[in-house]
Each structure stands twice: as C-alpha cells, then as structure tokens.
Amino acid sequence: HERFRRQRQMCIRDRSYSAIIKTNFGEMKIEFFTEDAPVTVNNFVSLARDGYYDSVIFHRVISGFMIQGGDPSGTGHGDYGKYPGYEFEDELNNQRPYEKGIMAMANRGPNTNGSQFFIMHVDYPLPYSYTIFGQVTEGLEVIDSIAAVQTDAADKPLEDVVIESVEISEN
C-alpha cells in the first residue's frame, strides 16, 4: 500500500457521503457525519477512492465490543507512523454515544488518527477520545457475523475478514 507524506487536501464538498464496505462476510452501508467530522470523513473518502482499504483485513475483532480494520499491515501496529504516512487531529465535536454500528477512528492517543477505524458491535460506554465519523445504516447483521468469528489471544480472527472494496457515494 502506498504511503502518503501528508494528509490529503479536502476533496469532499458540502454534501452528504456514504459508503458501501464490501467484505467476505457481506456488505455494510455507512452514512458519514460530514458536519461533525469533515477532516476525518475527507480522510476516509480519499483513501477509499484510492483503493487504500481494498483487500485490507479486520485485524481485531472483539465480540461484545467492536471490529477494527484499516491497517494494511494487518497487525494493528502498522498504521501508527507508517500507514498511511501521516497523522491528524481528533474531531471530538460529536457527543453521540458509542452505539452498535457507530464508526470511529482508532488511535494510540490524542491526535494520532491515520487509517485505522472501528465499528461498534454493541452499545459500549467508551470515553469521548475517538473521532466518531459515521454509522452503519444497513448491514448490522454483517457486524454480528464478523464478531462471531473465532480469534486468537490477541483478538485477531483465525480466518481472514477481508474488506474487498469500499464504494463511496455523494448524495
């Protein structure tokens, strides 16, 4: 996967955006919160349009909590500093609860967003330390199917859960 030296320029316009994330377990439709997290949505949209997430796995799956992906190394460690090659600031304007289907950026501390994201499997009381930028509106059963896979001691699925493609739509 290509590394970038800095975050992409704003490519999104004053519209609403959605995505279809196609996995080997089914499809999920995501509606993005462009007003709450424009920089984060722009980051995800631009990476997805470049095919960045294609063939990347969900490397961390915790049933009763969340599913996490977006690291091309497939480890959860490759994003920080290496992928996508930059970090950007949190957008913590959104005080939505972390409910099933909420999509947020994974990070290793304040202002360390890159390409990794997680999708909530269930409602969970997380601190507002993660930029919430979207919500699954169709395909919640896909989250359940992914969350049901067997994992190792590090929460990595024993069978690959693959993001086959991400299709972005402007509405």
Regions found by a protein language model. Give the residues of each.
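Cyclophilin-type peptidyl-prolyl cis-trans isomerase
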Residues: 71-130, 150-153, 162-165
